[in-house]
């Protein structure tokens, strides 16, 4: 008889600990077993975290396991990463385990599901690498052959050939007997990148992992990967948890995108997880972007990442010309429409040449909020507290947080007035206006309302790629890595949407969005044109984006960050407290603040801010309050340790308040 410590598959903070069981079966760390649990001895799944342990209680009272799952098991590396995630993010063991395990049932023999079964493979042979690509690969190959863990940041302008560098690196890694993970920021991009990879490496070597797969598809892909049948995994951020062994490289394309930071529990950063896993395998991390995050670029300047620059587009295709349009002048001239005169005239010319147009607005819906003109009341979701967005097609107010729809009242619920009006502009309104201007043209829209699943996304992208759609209107989905050859014009309908967000990253996000969407123009050999409309066209985020000058933007932004002591010069830790009782949430947040102040080292320079109500709380009669800690570099782990200690106190006190840690959140409002 030997003894093992397991984590029970029971989603409760009060059972989030090790339980000791005995067994005479062949059980090892990472196995999934069935165990009798609690007084009723109900059979529960459990995960073996430690084997061959010395029991801390009388062996006579220790229960024995019932069985071992013959198909699914985790590796030592996965278990170790789960333990690290629990400490890092203040989550339950089970929260981390669920990231690594499949959620579904096996297919019947011979009926495995392939999420990319229709992919024929897009073969793109590069005749000759550019000198910049060749230099990049020489630098990366040295790390691959050296078998040491290293980190690279590829700063390459749009269409500079970063994907070819990725694929040749992966080929090198696979030739050395290791495996690879290729991540993209949006599920919408997996189809295009999968086609290219199948064309290069063959379907049998590729697996796909993302949250839009069915449970059966995800299970079957997980099993193929775990059995070693796939050497390359492609996916969105979920792919970083692929059950690969001997990982040689993890690549994050468009590394600056906020989607690499999970906004659900566990609130992990994909880069953090990648680095943790690669340390175990001595693999390399590659981050690629035309607009690297300020944090990543600063790490490159500090020597934490090796910087590789691709300054020229492949085949020396010129970068598109960017024009800034002052919408204040349009108003003075009497133009109150969505299109400036310049955007309209250029749209006509582009369509006459037989080229396509992309119109970008990072707001979906028809109108962005519904308000009473009499008293100013803004209609909000009764469950989430988020202002409702009007969707004309559905004639409803929609909460973009929980997805629920509500009939728009005829009278104001606050004052009884009939003056209910719709304000702001979303992609649905842009589509309607564009159809009025160009009724004979084929117009498509790509946002979360028109593309609710991977199949719909692929259909819209394919239609535009094949030239069946003349004008594509979209949110940030159209700005991320899509490669269209016949786009002659990109119009940014309003650059002020992201610029006016009350967040310290707003200028960075604006620069990135404008630069990335501009990169969709002129990829087929001809110089494209980008028209950016704004009421603040002199903002440095827009002027530097118009000049394709990342370095100037970075130099200006990093000075502001340093002066304001924002990341990368500090770390932000947001601690959320959620409860059905609002007073309990407030009180617990206040107690945490007081606890951290008592733990605080004199002179460490940390700021611990008072509890605030989150504007994004989800769930009926559920309240979320948070405290924010801004701590100097080097003190982050200390404060995470103290926060976890406070969480243990809550468990001991049987508190009903749930606590979550969010390290360097992408939004603090």
Where are these regions (language model features)?
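Intrinsically disordered, low-complexity basic tails and flexible linkers associated
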Residues: 22, 656, 667-669
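Solvent-exposed, membrane-proximal periplasmic/extracellular interface segments of envelope transport
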Residues: 55-67, 612-614, 619-631
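Terminal, basic amphipathic appendages of nucleotide-handling enzymes
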Residues: 1-153, 159
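Long, charged, helix-prone linker segments
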Residues: 102-106, 660-668
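Inter-lobe coupling/hinge segments of SF2-like helicase ATPases
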Residues: 130, 148-231, 235-576, 581-586, ...
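Short, conserved charged micro-motifs
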Residues: 27-31, 582-587, 634-644
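Short beta-strand elements
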Residues: 599-614, 655-664
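A common structural junction motif
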Residues: 593-602, 644-657
């Amino acid at each position: 008889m030997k003894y093992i410590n397991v984590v029970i598959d029971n989603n409760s903070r009060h059972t989030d600990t090790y339980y000791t069981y005995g067994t005479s079966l062949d059980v090892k760390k990472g196995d999934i077993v069935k165990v009798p649990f609690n007084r009723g001895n109900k059979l529960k799944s459990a995960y073996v975290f430690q084997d061959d342990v010395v029991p801390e209680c009388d062996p006579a009272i220790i229960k024995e396991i019932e069985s071992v799952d013959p198909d699914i098991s985790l590796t030592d590396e996965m278990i170790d990463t789960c333990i690290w995630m629990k400490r890092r993010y203040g989550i339950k063991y089970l929260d981390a385990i669920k990231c690594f395990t499949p959620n579904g049932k096996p297919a019947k023999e011979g009926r495995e599901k392939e999420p990319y079964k229709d992919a024929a493979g897009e073969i793109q042979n590069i005749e000759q690498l550019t000198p910049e690509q060749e230099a990049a690969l020489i630098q990366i190959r040295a790390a691959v052959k050296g078998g040491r863990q290293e980190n690279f940041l590829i700063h390459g302008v749009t269409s500079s050939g970063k994907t070819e560098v990725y694929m040749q690196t992966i080929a090198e890694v696979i030739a050395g007997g290791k495996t690879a993970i290729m991540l993209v920021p949006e599920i919408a991009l997996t189809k295009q990148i999968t086609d290219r990879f199948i064309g290069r490496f063959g379907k049998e070597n590729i697996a796909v992992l993302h949250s839009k797969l069915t449970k059966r598809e995800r299970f079957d892909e997980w099993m193929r990967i775990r059995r070693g049948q796939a050497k390359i995994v492609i996916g969105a951020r979920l792919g970083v948890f692929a059950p690969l062994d001997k990982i040689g490289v993890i690549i994050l394309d468009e590394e600056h995108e906020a989607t690499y930071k999970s906004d659900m529990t566990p609130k992990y950063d994909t880069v953090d997880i990648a680095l943790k896993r690669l340390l175990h395998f001595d693999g390399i991390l590659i981050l690629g972007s035309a607009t690297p995050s300020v944090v990543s670029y600063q790490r490159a300047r500090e020597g934490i990442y090796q910087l590789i620059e691709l300054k020229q587009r492949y085949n020396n295709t010129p970068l598109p010309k960017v024009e800034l349009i002052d919408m204040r002048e349009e108003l003075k001239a009497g133009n109150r429409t969505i299109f400036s005169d310049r955007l309209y005239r250029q749209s006509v010319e582009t369509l006459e040449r037989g080229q396509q147009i992309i119109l970008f607005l990072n707001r979906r819906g028809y109108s962005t909020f519904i308000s009473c003109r009499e008293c100013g009341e803004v209609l909000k979701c009764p469950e989430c507290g988020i202002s409702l967005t009007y969707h004309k097609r559905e004639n409803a107010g929609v909460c973009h947080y929980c997805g629920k729809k509500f009939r728009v009242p005829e009278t104001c619920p606050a004052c009884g007035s009939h003056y209910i009006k719709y304000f702001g502009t979303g992609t649905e309104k842009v589509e309607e206006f564009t159809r009025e201007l160009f009724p004979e043209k084929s117009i498509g829209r790509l946002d979360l309302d028109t593309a609710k699943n991977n199949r719909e996304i692929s259909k819209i992208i394919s239609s535009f790629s094949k030239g069946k759609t003349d004008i594509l209107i979209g949110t940030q989905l159209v700005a991320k890595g899509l490669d269209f050859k016949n786009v002659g014009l990109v119009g940014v309908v309003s650059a002020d949407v992201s610029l006016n967000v009350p967040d310290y990253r707003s200028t960075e996000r604006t620069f990135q969005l404008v630069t990335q969407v501009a990169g969709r123009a002129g990829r087929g050999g001809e110089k494209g044109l980008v028209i950016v409309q704004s009421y603040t066209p002199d903002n440095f985020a827009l002027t530097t984006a118009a000049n394709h000058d990342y370095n100037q933007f970075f130099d200006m932004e990093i000075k502001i960050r340093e002066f304001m002591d924002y990341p990368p010069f500090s770390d932000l830790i947001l601690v959320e407290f959620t409860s059905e009782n609002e007073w309990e949430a407030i009180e617990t947040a206040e107690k945490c603040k007081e606890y951290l102040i008592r733990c605080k080292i004199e002179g460490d320079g940390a700021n611990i801010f008072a509890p605030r109500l989150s504007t994004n709380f989800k769930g009926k009669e559920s309240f979320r309050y948070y405290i924010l800690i801004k701590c100097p570099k080097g003190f982050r782990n200390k404060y995470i340790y103290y926060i976890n200690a406070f969480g243990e106190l809550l468990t001991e006190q049987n508190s009903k308040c749930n606590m979550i840690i969010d390290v360097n959140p992408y939004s603090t409002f």
